């Protein structure tokens, strides 16, 4: 594979050093909500690398470790002598204190988890406009016992002596709470204070500046060469198709592989929308029978995913050779994909991950290395909400921008057990009814995902005067900000009743509808 970074990319104004926190990505998103560009990087980043990037501020994330554990993640101590403002959050603050000569002790029975009012002790730039006794979100076991020289305590709680600290002269700050989570009442105020007042960042990160910077980079990278894009119809690949079409026009070819597991009417809609309405070159590949044959007799969900992913690659290889040659491959890789799949916490000396790998994403490292493409990934540093804003700016309609996430393997992993034509047709119809009624009720844009799942068992029912023995369908509706966590959606009973009545009356081989009220965690959004 060739280089996957475009030239002259914008450097982040704020660097977030990741110590294994579940909130590191959220910190970056919150800063970008303040229109400041931020990136999550490894805690192993060197002082020299930071100086090369030249950020205006640095944030040390939280993390699950104690600073006194043998394997506790650390950072280059010289970071604190660069003159760049540093904000340590939770573990990040404790690490800074320990590295600079203070002491951190186990909290024992005085741990804090959840909401806690903070008492402000001294005025400071960091807590400017934060009201006294406002609620902040705590999640820590250890606490600071003694501050390093030059630091003062600027806030405390009932159980935490040092809820916020400051060394104004060296521009080093710390908070024991998590300002990035929505439960922290003045969390965004604290973040903006650090970003604007302390780090002197400009609010110049938005969709317009992204387009102004990215389109010339794409043109510079691609030149007059041809680019191939695998189009799925989701918001990511659709936005990328529009972006590339704007940048390089007829040099772009989209390949739409219909594996037979898409939602009702979707292949026809996508071809009509992209090829006919917007005149983007799309090659339609009908591989339905091929994929279904490969899944014959397969029931394990992970095996289904691997088979579908592997077959997609083989079809893609064959068709790219037939349609090519292509110099570049465009992928709709997003920043969370990079964080989760590549990992930010890689020890540059050993290559080992600090955090456990969550999952492999289709867009990151999914294609074989012997495909001689150079990568074009202009969305690689964007979050999902930023991609939606970009799609809107490029003229994508709401029916694309606001469509619910759909898994790469499609309906094949919403059919538990073996996949068949009969089951696909059944689930496709049931799923269409779910989305149709959710839209009619005006709930679609308020729900992260709404879909149907077909179970591999049959249940007894009565229709008319006859006994039935048919499949049950599960209705799954969840609300979420980013898909990392989710709660089940409180759908009005009237809507649930309409969905149930329509499915059992309009979909053959279904006689029962059940509603999944499991949150994530402990469950996942998808059933497989």
From Swiss-Prot:
CDD domains: GATase1_GMP_Synthase, GMP_synthase_C. Keywords: ATP-binding, Glutamine amidotransferase, GMP biosynthesis, Ligase, Nucleotide-binding, Purine biosynthesis. ATP binds at residues 232-238. It is an enzyme of class 6 (ligase). Residues 13-204 form the Glutamine amidotransferase type-1 domain. SUPFAM superfamilies: Adenine nucleotide alpha hydrolases-like (SSF52402), Class I glutamine amidotransferase-like (SSF52317), GMP synthetase C-terminal dimerisation domain (SSF54810). One of its GO terms (molecular function) is ATP binding. Signal peptide: none annotated. Its EC number is 6.3.5.2. The active site is at residues 90, 178, 180. It catalyses: XMP + L-glutamine + ATP + H2O = GMP + L-glutamate + AMP + diphosphate + 2 H(+). InterPro entries: Class_I_gatase-like, GATASE, GMP_synth_C, GMP_synth_GATase, GMP_synthase, GMPS_ATP_PPase_dom, NAD/GMP_synthase, Rossmann-like_a/b/a_fold. GO terms for cellular component: cytosol. Catalyzes the synthesis of GMP from XMP. This is GMP synthase [glutamine-hydrolyzing].
């Amino acid at each position: 594979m060739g280089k996957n970074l475009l030239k002259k990319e914008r450097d982040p104004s704020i660097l977030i050093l990741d110590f294994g926190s579940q909130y590191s990505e959220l910190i970056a998103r919150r800063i970008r909500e303040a229109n400041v560009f931020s990136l999550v990087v490894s805690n192993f980043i060197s002082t020299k690398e930071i100086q090369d990037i030249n950020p205006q501020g640095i944030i040390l994330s939280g993390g699950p470790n104690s600073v006194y554990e043998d394997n506790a993640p650390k950072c280059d101590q010289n970071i604190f002598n660069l003159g760049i403002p540093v904000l340590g959050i939770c573990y990040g603050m404790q690490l800074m204190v320990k590295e600079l000569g203070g002491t951190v002790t186990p909290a024992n029975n005085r741990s804090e988890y959840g909401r806690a009012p903070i008492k402000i002790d001294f005025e400071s730039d960091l807590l400017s406009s934060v009201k006294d006794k406002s609620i902040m979100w705590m999640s820590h076991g250890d606490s600071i016992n003694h501050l390093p020289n030059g630091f003062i305590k600027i806030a405390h709680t009932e159980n935490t002596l040092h809820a916020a600290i400051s060394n104004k002269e060296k521009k080093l700050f710390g908070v024991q709470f998590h300002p990035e989570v929505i439960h922290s009442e003045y969390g965004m105020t604290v973040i903006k204070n650090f970003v604007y007042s302390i780090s002197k960042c400009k609010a110049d990160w938005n969709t317009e500046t992204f387009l102004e910077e990215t389109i010339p980079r794409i043109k510079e990278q691609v030149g007059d060469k041809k680019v191939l894009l695998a189009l799925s119809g989701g918001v990511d690949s659709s936005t990328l198709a529009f972006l590339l079409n704007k940048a390089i026009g007829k040099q772009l070819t989209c390949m739409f592989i219909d594996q037979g597991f898409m939602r009702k009417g979707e292949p026809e809609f996508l071809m009509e929308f992209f090829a006919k309405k917007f005149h983007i070159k799309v090659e339609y590949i009908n591989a339905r029978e091929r994929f279904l044959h490969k899944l014959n007799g397969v029931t394990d969900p992970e095996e289904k995913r691997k088979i579908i992913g592997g077959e997609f690659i083989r079809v893609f290889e064959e068709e790219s050779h037939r349609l090519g040659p292509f110099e570049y491959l465009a992928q709709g890789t997003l920043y969370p994909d990079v964080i989760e799949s590549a990992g930010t916490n890689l020890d540059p000396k050993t290559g080992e991950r600090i955090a456990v790998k969550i999952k492999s994403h289709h867009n990151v490292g999914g294609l074989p290395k012997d495909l001689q493409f150079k990568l074009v990934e202009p969305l690689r540093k964007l979050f999902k909400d930023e991609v939606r804003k970009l799609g809107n700016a490029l003229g994508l309609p709401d029916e694309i921008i606001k469509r619910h996430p759909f898994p790469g393997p499609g309906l094949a992993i919403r059919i538990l057990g073996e996949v068949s034509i009969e089951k696909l047709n059944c689930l496709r119809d049931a799923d269409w009814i779910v989305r149709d009624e959710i839209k009619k009720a005006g709930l679609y844009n308020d729900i992260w995902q709404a879909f149907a799942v077909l179970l591999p068992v049959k249940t007894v029912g009565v229709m008319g005067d006859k006994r039935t023995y048919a499949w049950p369908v599960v209705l799954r509706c969840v609300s979420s900000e980013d898909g990392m966590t989710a709660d089940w959606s409180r759908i009005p009973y009237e809507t649930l009743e309409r969905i149930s009545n329509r499915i059992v009356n309009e979909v053959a081989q279904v006689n029962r509808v059940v509603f999944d009220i499991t949150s994530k965690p402990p469950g996942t959004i998808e059933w497989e």
